[in-house]
């Protein structure tokens, strides 16, 4: 779905669950302002074709449940970075794994990057487990400076294009994850020529159910 200014309010709503702040690099008092800055930065990145943000919603209820970002690294040419936020009510339902699938796929197949890096909080055991299970390589802990001072401890994970094609694509096919051909074309068009001032539309990779 489209990246819009109103998504700042959505992220603020998610943050009202105290558990949310255990897994993001913001502190509670700064959430409203930083949530707005977060969306402003996402829109600016889209306009400059540096990063692409998508919000995923439930097919059943239409409720927005998560956000995933694919961004070209500012520091290293040929490398992309993936980040995501999942609404607390949607935790432990497998969405983080699906978002990671999509983020990796988008970076390798649409942005044509040679490697993708994903950071996870050192204390976030669930995220670290997912990334290791998908075959990303841990590069060890690092310090991440916080806007309000101090730092957080992060684990950085990396996967190369060859590893994605050899290891992860067969796993995606075995688990019957797929993107319809029409949506592949839409995603490619968005990556090559995103509209100014707003996000595009895409269907997150979904589990295809065989007809009974």
Q: What does each model-identified segment do?
A:
Residues 19-41:
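Conserved GNAT-fold acetyl-CoA-binding loop/helix
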């Amino acid at each position: 779905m489209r990246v819009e200014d109103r998504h700042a309010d959505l992220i603020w709503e998610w943050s009202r669950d105290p558990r949310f702040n255990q897994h993001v690099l913001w502190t509670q008092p700064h959430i409203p302002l930083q949530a707005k800055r977060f969306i402003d930065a996402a829109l600016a990145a889209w306009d400059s074709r540096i990063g692409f943000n998508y919000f995923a919603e439930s097919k059943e209820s239409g409720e927005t449940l998560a956000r995933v970002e694919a961004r070209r690294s500012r520091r290293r040419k040929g490398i992309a970075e993936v980040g995501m936020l999942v609404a607390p009510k949607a935790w432990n339902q497998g969405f983080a794994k699906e978002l990671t699938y999509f983020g990796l796929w988008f970076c390798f197949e649409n942005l044509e990057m040679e490697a993708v890096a994903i950071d996870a909080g050192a204390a976030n055991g669930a995220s670290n487990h997912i990334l290791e299970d998908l075959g990303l390589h841990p590069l060890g802990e690092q310090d991440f400076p916080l806007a309000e001072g101090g730092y957080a401890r992060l684990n950085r994970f990396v996967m190369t294009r060859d590893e994605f094609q050899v290891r992860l694509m067969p796993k995606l096919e075995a688990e019957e994850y797929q993107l319809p051909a029409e949506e592949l074309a839409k995603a490619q068009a968005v990556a090559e020529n995103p509209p100014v001032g707003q996000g595009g539309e895409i269907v997150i990779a979904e589990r295809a159910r065989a007809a009974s």
